């Protein structure tokens, strides 16, 4: 018997299922309404997100020349250690070093006396420590440019200046106004003698 005759003679099987009724549930309605609400919010949201003022763009490529990337240089392991710590850059220009020293001297002369008279002990200590932090390094740099005997004398004067600064710092920590004023004058005199030797 051929395949066509087998298919044609097969008896038809009646479906055992009855009629299927589809009902919409409340959850599917909520999902549809939620989707509509979300699309409406998405359509309105970009208008609300617009800035009231325009965005200003600045070309700050020149700040790299002024030292903006120093923190990244400090982390760059491909650079030598003295470059990463900034020692090479600070010693590169003696004119900049002299300018920093004169600025520190001016701040010590002008600010510390006012802070001591007003009993601003914390400000006086912080200003002193800020200025001496750079002066230690810069005085060494300036002394290293001198001849052997002049360098030795300058480093000796620097050591006396640092001791006077430590005495002044102790007087500031003790909050002794008379002692601090006296030691400030000694510190200024020692700084002037060091600067006369290195500048």
Swiss-Prot record:
Principal localisation: plastid
UniProt cross-references to SUPFAM superfamilies, sorted A to Z: Oxygen-evolving enhancer protein 3 (SSF101112)
Location(s) in or outside the cell: Plastid, Chloroplast thylakoid membrane
Keywords on record: Chloroplast, Membrane, Photosynthesis, Photosystem II, Plastid, Thylakoid, Transit peptide
Tree of life domain: Eukaryota
InterPro entries linked to this entry: PsbQ-like_dom_sf, PSII_PsbQ, PSII_PsbQ_pln
Transmembrane annotation, as ranges: none
GO biological process: photosynthesis
GO MF, one example: calcium ion binding
Cellular component terms per the entry's GO annotation: chloroplast thylakoid membrane; extrinsic component of membrane; photosystem II oxygen evolving complex
A Pfam short name: PsbQ
Family: Belongs to the PsbQ family.
Protein name: Oxygen-evolving enhancer protein 3, chloroplastic
Species, as recorded: Chlamydomonas reinhardtii (Chlamydomonas smithii)
């Amino acid at each position: 018997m051929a395949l066509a005759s087998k298919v044609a003679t097969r008896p038809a099987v009646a479906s055992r299922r009855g009629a299927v009724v589809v009902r919409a549930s409340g959850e599917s309605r909520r999902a549809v309404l939620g989707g509509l609400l979300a699309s409406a919010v998405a359509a309105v949201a970009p208008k609300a997100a617009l800035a009231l003022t325009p965005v200003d763009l600045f070309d700050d490529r020149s700040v790299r020349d002024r030292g903006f990337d120093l923190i990244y240089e400090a982390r760059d392991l491909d650079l030598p250690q003295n470059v990463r710590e900034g020692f090479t850059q600070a010693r590169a220009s003696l004119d900049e070093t002299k300018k920093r020293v004169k600025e520190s001297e001016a701040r010590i002369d002008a600010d510390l006396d006012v802070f001591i008279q007003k009993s601003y002990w914390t400000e006086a200590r912080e200003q002193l420590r800020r200025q001496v932090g750079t002066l230690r390094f810069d005085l060494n740099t300036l002394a290293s440019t001198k001849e052997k005997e002049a360098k030795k004398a300058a480093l000796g004067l620097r050591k006396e200046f640092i001791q006077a600064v430590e005495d002044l710092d102790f007087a500031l920590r003790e909050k002794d106004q008379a002692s601090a004023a006296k030691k400030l004058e000694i510190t200024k005199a020692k700084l002037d003698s060091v600067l006369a030797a290195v500048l």
